[in-house]
Amino acid sequence: MSKQKVVVGMSGGVDSSVTAWLLKEQGYDVVGLFMKNWEDDDDSEYCSTRQDWIDVVSVADLIGIDVEAVNFAAEYKDRVFAEFLREYSAGRTPNPDVLCNAEIKFKAFLDHAMSLGAETIATGHYARVRQNERNGRFELLKAFDHTKDQSYFLHRLNQAQLSKTLFPLGEIPKTKVREIAEQIALPNAKKKDSTGICFIGERPFRDFLNRYLPTKPGPMKTTDGKVVGEHIGLAFYTFGQRKGIGLGGSKDGSGEPWFVAGKDIASNTLYVAQGHDHAWLLSHTLSAGNTSWVAGEPPADGFACGAKTRYRQADAPCTFSSAGSGEGLFELNFDAAQWAVTPGQSAVLYDGDVCLGGGIIEHAVTGQPVAREPQKAALLNAR
């Protein structure tokens, strides 16, 4: 009886390396595939593509599997990076990792794996997949280790993708994964986890963005219309941002920090608010579009669920309702006010551990006070 062939996405990190080893131990015919999704800056200190490939080859040799590299840079720039720049240009804050998973790691990669004769693919993501015995649908669940759960980034995966996907680390705590890596003497056992957006690396984000988007200085105003400074360009700020604004405590002596509270694209104005719990930063309601549902259909109107509006956030109790426009929009009404709900980010819904899917945040209704210049007080969440 032939072994089931699985192609593992290997990045050179500990998680994907242990994933490959676990599947080999379970009797699968394992092939490693290293994806190169970004070509610029390979000679700089910020990108470690060459070293990552060396680590992949070393791990593959140790555990006894074949490995190959495939270049998806063109697909990445077309399907992910171009959208990333469009969103920032529009004053929003996108999450490219969500789009990368849906378009590259579980589409381009999946298609390539199938062309190699694979029956399934696997990655080192911390999440789980199961098939519902009652209706036969595949479900995306949070990882056993909730502190490492990555279902937020995977919420746009569909039934076809999930049916061909394995997440071996979904039931294992991160600490155990590290232990396994050391026990089997993986050459990268002590390698640090990657952080940040893959094509940016560890460089300052503003420096990277400035290479692709021009600066366009404009007024920085308080929520009541008082000019307090100048910004370098709306694309370089995100809702709720504290660092890099260039404002200290106010002259009224309150000394509370300032936060980005809104953008008006038409007048190129950046609005700032003082105090973490300022009304302009708190929202009870959001609307989202560009939806994707794991089951292929949205929840019923009035469904009580939990939602995350950013990664690592605890599920916030809320009620789901369709916007009734027929365009795939939905609204969430939260039981408690949410802080800095940011357009461009994903609102992801959960029923306990089950990830239902979600959409891209379009607008959040804040408890903002009346501005002196209401016609210019279009918040960041006004597209």
Curated annotation (Swiss-Prot):
Region (Interaction with target base in tRNA): 95-97
Location within or outside the cell: Cytoplasm
Pfam family, any one: tRNA_Me_trans_C
Any GO BP: tRNA wobble position uridine thiolation
Cystine crosslinks: C100-C198
Keyword vocabulary terms for this entry: ATP-binding, Cytoplasm, Disulfide bond, Nucleotide-binding, RNA-binding, Transferase, tRNA processing, tRNA-binding
Residues forming the catalytic site: C100, C198
Gene Ontology, cellular component aspect: cytoplasm
Main location: cytoplasm
This enzyme's EC code(s): 2.8.1.13
Similarity remark: Belongs to the MnmA/TRMU family.
HAMAP family linked: tRNA_thiouridyl_MnmA (MF_00144)
Protein name: tRNA-specific 2-thiouridylase MnmA
Record organism: Paraburkholderia phytofirmans (strain DSM 17436 / LMG 22146 / PsJN)
Gene giving rise to this polypeptide: mnmA
